[in-house]
Amino acid sequence: CKQLNLELDISKVIESYTQLASIHDVVIVEGIGGIMTPISKNYFVSDLISDLQLSSIIVTGSKIGTVNHLMLTYEHAQQKKLKLKGFVVNQNISTGYELSNLKHQIFGLTGHKVFGAIPYHESFNIESYVENFPNFIDISGLGFENI
């Protein structure tokens, strides 16, 4: 919005979400860059999550330094009293933390479940990804069981 010199009306975003939620069993809201991404000057993604009373899943990378980033995000979510379901690891690089160690460390530091990891692939193929998604992510406990 800032680059386009526009002001976003948050009330319209909330109204649109409420309308969508009234007609759909599930509405997935993407975090547009992270929990502290500004939507407007004094309104952040974490404020929107709170105002919409959403549960969250934190998606983290697997590169070195990711635990620091993840913990800063987690601590902010705790400060804002956001409802956190757990974590997903996006292995967007071929190097970095060994996955099982990272998952164990995340659980040990936060006590929250790591639902799985999206593996790194040299050549990304959306059809293959969608087909294999259930092998990567355990969606039990996310609230989709009765849909």
PLM segments and residue spans:
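ATP-dependent carboxylate-amine ligase catalytic core
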Residues: 1-43, 50, 62-71, 75, ...
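Structural motif
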Residues: 28-30, 57, 88
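Secondary-structure junction/capping motif
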Residues: 43-44, 113
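Active-site phosphate/pyrophosphate- and oxyanion-stabilizing loops and adjacent acidic/basic residues
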Residues: 46-47, 104
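Short glycine-/polar-rich loops that comprise or flank the Walker A/P-loop
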Residues: 52-55, 83-84
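Short hydrophobic alpha-helical runs that function as membrane-insertion/retention elements
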Residues: 56-59, 116
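C-terminal lobe/tail of nucleotide-utilizing enzymes
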Residues: 75-147
